[in-house]
């Protein structure tokens, strides 16, 4: 009996060791050797307070999951099919799980925000999504690139070559994209404060550097069964590596929060589904009772707190990285 017990203990120990070894191979535990623990504690709890219960999921994603468990964060936006759909009157989701794309039917053609990763996705996902919604690629009259990361502009050149939309980006974004093989042909430059009216929709644009130097944010009206709301679409909430870029990101987020408050923004739209919780919202829209709240409409106070909380999460990451910011 004793011999069997020893054998069982040895087997359990061996299996435990094997599991631990496999776990270490599978899961990369993030450490922060230069962490400023006092500053992390300060800003993490300030961000949590700013978020409150209503924004706790956004707080958890930006302040904790994306920083301490980046592999799990990345797993929330793996490439995958999402059925295209109308989210507001004439505003459509036409992206995939890893990166969003939006189309607004202005009455004078479609304005498309972002072009997915590459030509194959533009041809195989974005255009078929439009076709399923009753449009065609030729309806794309305007293309807005929110920032100069390839997952947002990789399909732009294919769209330009095939449908010739007027293509818009900020000057810093164009400066980066034109030097990349397969990047779009430079077209129209959007500057700070530019207003673009197409058909019955007006877009107010702001250059919000931080995530990238050329990140572009916009404010525009949306309608829910005819009821007017104002959407804020921030160009990129991902936290940059350099301290100077983090300073820019915080300043841009706080400035856009002020602009959004002046414009009475109450609706959150983003260029990744895990930043505006689109996957959750789609299911809620599918099961929305008559007269029920629209999940993208979070209210003006919550939108303001969302941006300021994101800025505080940037401070958390700086403190984890041992960086001292100027803002």
Model-inferred region functions:
Residues 1-21:
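Fungal secretory targeting signals
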Residues 77-133, 217-238:
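Conserved beta-strand hairpin/beta-sheet module of binuclear metal-dependent hydrolase folds
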Residues 86-92, 193, 201-204:
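Short, hydrophobic/aromatic-rich segments at coil-to-beta transitions
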Residues 90, 104, 114, 147, ...:
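Divalent metal-coordination and catalytic microenvironments
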Residues 110, 117-119, 195-197, 202-304:
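Metallo-beta-lactamase
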């Amino acid at each position: 009996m004793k011999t069997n017990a020893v054998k069982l203990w040895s087997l359990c120990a061996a299996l435990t060791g094997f599991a631990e070894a496999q776990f270490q191979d599978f899961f990369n535990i993030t450490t922060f050797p230069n962490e400023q623990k006092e500053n992390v504690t300060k800003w993490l709890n300030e961000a949590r307070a700013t978020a409150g219960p209503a924004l706790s999921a956004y707080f958890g994603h930006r302040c904790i999951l994306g920083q301490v468990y980046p592999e799990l964060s990345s797993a929330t936006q793996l490439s995958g099919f999402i059925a295209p759909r109308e989210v507001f009157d004439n505003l459509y989701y036409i992206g995939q799980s890893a990166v969003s794309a939006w189309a607004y039917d202005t009455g004078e053609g479609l304005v498309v925000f972002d072009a997915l990763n590459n030509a194959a996705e533009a041809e195989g996902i974005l255009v078929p999504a439009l076709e399923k919604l009753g449009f065609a690629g030729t309806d794309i009259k305007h293309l807005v690139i929110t920032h100069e990361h390839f997952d947002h502009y990789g399909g732009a050149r294919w769209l330009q070559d095939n449908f010739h939309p007027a293509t818009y980006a900020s000057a810093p974004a164009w400066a980066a994209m034109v030097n990349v093989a397969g990047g779009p042909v430079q077209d129209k430059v959007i500057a700070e404060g530019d207003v673009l009216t197409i058909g019955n929709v007006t877009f107010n644009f702001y250059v919000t550097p931080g995530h990238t130097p050329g990140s572009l944010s916009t404010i525009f009206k949306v309608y829910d069964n005819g009821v007017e709301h104002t959407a804020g679409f921030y160009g990129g909430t991902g936290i940059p590596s350099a301290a100077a870029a983090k300073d820019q990101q915080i300043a841009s987020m706080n400035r856009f929060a002020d602009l959004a408050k002046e414009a009475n923004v109450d609706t959150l739209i983003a260029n990744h589904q895990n930043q505006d919780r689109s996957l959750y919202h789609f299911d809620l829209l599918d099961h929305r009772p008559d007269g029920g709240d629209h999940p993208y409409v979070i209210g003006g106070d919550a939108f303001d707190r969302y941006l300021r909380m994101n800025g505080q999460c940037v401070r958390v990451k700086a403190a984890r990285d041992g960086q001292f910011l100027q803002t």
